[in-house]
Structure formats: structure tokens, C-alpha cells
Amino acid sequence: MTVAKKHWFQIAFQLRGSVIGAIYKRVICCALFGVLVTLLYQLKIPVSQPILGSVIPSIVLGLLLVFRTNTAYDRFWEGRKAWGSIVNNTRNLARQIWVSVEEVSLKDREAKISVLNLLVAFAVATKLHLRGEPINSELEDLISTSRYFKLKSMNNPPLEVAFWIGDYLQQQYTCKCLNSYQLTSIQELLNNLVDNLGSCERILRTPMPLAYSIHLKQLLLLYCFLLPFQMVESLGWWTGLVVGLVSFTLFGIEAIGLEIENPFGYDPNDLPLDAICNTMKRNIDDLTSLSPNVRSHDLGETSNVTI
């Protein structure tokens, strides 16, 4: 989901990203029912029943819809915060590893670049995992061939990637390329990444309670189909149009909640996970283009600290 600056009327009449496609059939159905009730009224059939307006108080239905939409937006915002945290933790982890891990040989530099690519692989694997997609070519350039095929067989690929990163950190500590304080600090960032993964999984696998969704839909249908009987005496042939407008409003609010409650897909209102992953890849590439300010034994490099 990307938001470009547009004129007010451009946004108002924009179809992409709106819920019109999801609700127009229900709206037309309600409007036609309003026309049918009007026709019956014109044929002197006593269908006008204004008292039906008290069957479902408007304020009750409004509160239910507001609660539904707010709950869905909370899920959307929690998902965005989790991915924002993934970005920040990835940047901090990459910086800490690049600067703190000492290099003894060229292989150490290559290993550091590989583990930094694993950080991007974690984000990509998380994206695919949340979308229920298999491991694909997006990861081929980020990890070795053996690890690529290993991930294909895993039930939770991002968790496996986090394990590989943790294994690398432990190896560097064993080789005395990291001290205990550095290891603890970096592992805390890695733990935060796994926590972010868990937050996203919680959003994905905790849908709205079924009973609430069923009852809200039943109330919406009752309200919209009882509406013509309340209005037909005063509105006449305008009843169908007004019922259509009211149902458009109510069904639209409910559809917005459905649209944003799972923010990890491909819909226009979902989070731009592809763009976020690409941003992290560019950040890592920029970082690895810099020389790490650490002690390097066999690389012919020394730390230059200017005070």
C-alpha cells in the first residue's frame, strides 16, 4: 500500500483500493428490494410499517460497526509496527555484526556478508510465511544453494534463518571474534526479530470471533431489508435509491474492516511488504560497501579512529 498525494476528488472517485467491488452486489440487491416494496405500496398493499425502525436501533448497529472497524485497524497497525520493528532490528543487527565482529581472513569478511544477507532472507522468508507461499527465487541470491533447499522443507522458514544467524554469532564468540557483552547485545536484537515474527503470526492466526462476524452480518441484512418498510410512505419512488445509499454506507464500513484485518497480502490496502524487503536489501548493500571499523589481522587494514 503506497499513498501518493492526490486531489480530494481523485481519491473520492478512485476505484482501486476501495470496497465498492466487494459490496456492490449487496447494495444493488437492497436497492432493488426497496423498489419492490415501493411498487407494492403503490399497488395499495399495506407495506408501510414505520414502527420497524425501532427493531434494530441505529446507534446499536453503529457501535457494532465502529468496534469492528477499530478492531481491524488495530490489527493493521500492530502489523505495521511489527514490520517497522523488523526493519529497525535488522539495521541494528547488521551494523553491530559489521562493526563488532573481528576479521582474521578474507573468509571472515565473506562470512559477515553472508550473515548480513541472512538478515534480508529473514525478512523475505517472513513475508512468504505470512502469505502462505512456498520458498521461491527471491531467496536464491541471499542464501547458499544447500540452505535454499533446506528452507523448502521447513515448516517455519524464518525461524530456521534466525537459527543460522544465532549459530554464526555463537561461532564468532567461540573464536573470540566477539566478547560476551557484544554477543549478549546482538542476541537481544536477534530475539527481537523472532518476537516480531511471533507478533505477525498472532495477527495472522487470530481472526475475529466467528459469532461476532455472523451476528453483525445478520443485523446488517435485517436493518437494510427492514429500511424500505420504514421509508416508503414518505419517500415513495425515492425509497430504492435511499436504501441503496444507506446500505452502501453500512456494508462499506463492514467491508473496510474485512479488508484491513489481515495486512500481509497483496491487496491495495495491505502493507507494502515487497517494498519494505527491498529497502532492507538496499540498506544491507550500502552497509557492506563500507569498510568495517574493526581490527583486521590478515587483511592489511587497521582501524582509524579520529578524535
From Swiss-Prot:
- Is Cell membrane included in the keywords of this UniProt record? yes
Query: InterPro entries under this entry?
Result: Bestrophin-like, YneE/VCCN1/2-like
Which residue ranges does UniProt annotate as crossing the membrane? Answer: 19-39, 47-67, 209-229, 238-258
- What domain of life does the native source organism fall in? Bacteria
Which GO cellular component term is one of those annotated? plasma membrane
Pfam families assigned to the protein according to its UniProt record, in alphabetical order: Bestrophin
Q: According to its record, how does it sit in the membrane? A: Multi-pass membrane protein
Say if the entry is tagged with keyword Transmembrane helix: yes
Spell out the molecular function terms from Gene Ontology.
Answer: chloride channel activity
Q: Spell out the subcellular localization from the entry.
A: Cell membrane
Keyword line? Cell membrane, Ion transport, Membrane, Transmembrane, Transmembrane helix, Transport
Looking up PANTHER family in the UniProt record yields: UPF0187 PROTEIN YNEE, VOLTAGE-DEPENDENT ANION CHANNEL-FORMING PROTEIN YNEE
What family classification does the UniProt entry report for this protein? Answer: Belongs to the anion channel-forming bestrophin (TC 1.A.46) family.
Spell out the protein name for this chain: Voltage-dependent anion channel-forming protein alr2987
Q: Which organism is it from?
A: Nostoc sp. (strain PCC 7120 / SAG 25.82 / UTEX 2576)
Please spell out the taxonomic lineage of the organism that makes this protein.
Answer: Bacteria, Bacillati, Cyanobacteriota, Cyanophyceae, Nostocales
